[in-house]
């Protein structure tokens, strides 16, 4: 699969986004965004650079120590970028820089300045403006620059609601990239099913997944991978990934690639030895039933809450049927008795961040719209010390897919990974 050539958005899309921001800004105002900086790992080594998602959304610029200023007056709307100047010596050591001279043409902005000039240039640009869209304390290095520039405004506004709502509805180009992120993530999970066997270590399976991501132009995961064998699956964010996989256990894998800045996010649970035991099958089928029903309900015009309420009812009834919960289903739901086995939400927005931005509405009652992308990930987690029948102790199951809201309902972007028991067992024993 050759995907590298497809891994970019056209620069006109970033310009169009900025135009939409200008339309929402107050007259005589400016909006200020800062990039990420390189993060120190230890001594003189840094982590691989990953751009701030908001900054990327409006610029498509992947260098640290930069700032974007959107200026709106009665006469003009300008996009101004501050960035590192060219430096032949540092570029020889650490990589190429775009530089001030090339930035306007490459980024489709009106003006460019060295970030070293920020404190002196900013007051001149912002003179006579009445409002500044700026969020302090996200990037403290940027706060320092703003402080040094000594600019004062009668009104400081938060740009996050505006940009978060924009990011929530994906463009056709974003959907194309997210489909590819889902496809590559699916390949990683399929590889994991094919290579898992008793006595391998969790980290070996993680390495198989990451290798598959890398083979398909996704160099980094979108979050820390979870490979949780046995009762480790009952730890929601288990990332140690250092235990052997035991014959007779399940393994829960929650892993996603990042492709062209966009996240994939899949969870699958399957038997280490390729064959579900009867108790494992019973819990798995209950989670799968809940997920399938949620997928039916997660369509434009409905809310996440509608789907989650149905998932809770299905799970509670199923847990009663298995003797794990005891009592009247309606009463158990009212008491939230299910929460000892299902303690997280049904899903989350997906995009530039794996837990992407955008309001869910009160009690997750926001109505889904075409262009939104959401995960659907019900689970059941029964700890080893739970007061339940012995055969269910230590079983943790989660099944997660990525859904795109469409005019026809939804599209599962991650459907390539098997989740029916027969399909999983056939793949693992092929």
UniProtKB/Swiss-Prot annotation:
It comes from the Bacteria. Mn(2+) 2 binds at residues 254, 265, 400. Binds 2 manganese ions per subunit. Its EC number is 3.4.11.9. This is Xaa-Pro aminopeptidase. It catalyses: Release of any N-terminal amino acid, including proline, that is linked to proline, even from a dipeptide or tripeptide. Its cofactor is Mn(2+). Keywords: Aminopeptidase, Hydrolase, Manganese, Metal-binding, Metalloprotease, Protease. Belongs to the peptidase M24B family. The keyword NAD does not apply. It is an enzyme of class 3 (hydrolase). Homotetramer. It comes from Haemophilus influenzae (strain ATCC 51907 / DSM 11121 / KW20 / Rd). The gene is pepP. Pfam families: AMP_N (PF05195), Peptidase_M24 (PF00557). Mn(2+) 1 binds at residues 265, 348, 377, 400.
């Amino acid at each position: 699969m050759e995907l590298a050539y497809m891994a970019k958005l056209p620069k006109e899309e970033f310009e169009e986004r900025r135009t939409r921001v200008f339309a929402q800004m107050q007259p005589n105002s400016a909006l200020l965004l800062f990039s990420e900086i390189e993060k120190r790992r230890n001594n003189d080594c840094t982590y691989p650079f990953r751009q701030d998602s908001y900054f990327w959304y409006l610029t498509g610029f992947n260098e640290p120590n930069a700032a974007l200023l959107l200026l709106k007056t009665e006469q003009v709307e300008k996009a101004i970028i501050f960035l590192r100047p060219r430096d032949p010596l540092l570029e020889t050591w650490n990589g190429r820089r775009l530089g001030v001279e090339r930035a306007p043409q490459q980024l489709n902005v009106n003006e460019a300045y060295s970030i070293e000039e920020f404190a002196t240039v900013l007051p001149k640009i912002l003179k006579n403006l009445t409002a500044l869209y700026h969020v302090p304390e996200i990037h403290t290095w940027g706060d320092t620059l703003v402080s040094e520039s000594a600019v004062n405004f009668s009104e400081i506004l938060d740009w996050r609601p505006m940009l978060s709502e924009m990011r929530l509805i994906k463009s056709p180009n974003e959907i194309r990239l997210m489909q590819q992120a889902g496809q590559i993530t699916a390949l990683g999970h399929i590889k994991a099913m094919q290579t898992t066997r008793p006595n391998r270590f969790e980290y070996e399976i993680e390495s198989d997944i990451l290798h598959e991501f890398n083979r398909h132009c996704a160099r980094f995961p979108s979050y820390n991978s979870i490979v949780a064998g046995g009762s480790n699956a009952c730890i929601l964010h288990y990332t140690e990934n250092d235990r052997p996989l035991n014959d007779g256990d399940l393994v829960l894998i929650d892993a996603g690639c990042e492709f062209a800045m966009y996240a994939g996010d899949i969870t699958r649970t399957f038997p280490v030895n390729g064959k579900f035991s009867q108790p494992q099958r019973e819990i798995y089928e209950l989670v799968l039933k809940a997920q399938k029903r949620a997928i039916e309900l997660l369509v434009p015009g409905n809310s996440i809450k509608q789907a989650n309420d149905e998932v809770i009812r299905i799970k509670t009834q199923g847990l009663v049927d298995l003797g794990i919960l005891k009592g009247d289903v309606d009463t158990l739901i009212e008491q939230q008795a299910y929460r000892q086995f299902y303690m997280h939400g049904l899903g989350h927005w997906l995009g530039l961040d794996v837990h992407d931005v955008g309001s869910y509405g009160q009690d997750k009652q926001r109505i889904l719209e075409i262009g939104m992308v959401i995960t659907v990930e019900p689970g059941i987690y029964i700890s080893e010390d739970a007061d339940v029948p012995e055969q269910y102790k230590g079983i943790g199951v989660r099944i997660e897919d990525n859904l795109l809201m469409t005019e026809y309902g939804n599209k599962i972007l991650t459907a390539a990974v098997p989740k029916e028991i027969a399909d999983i067992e056939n793949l693992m024993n092929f």
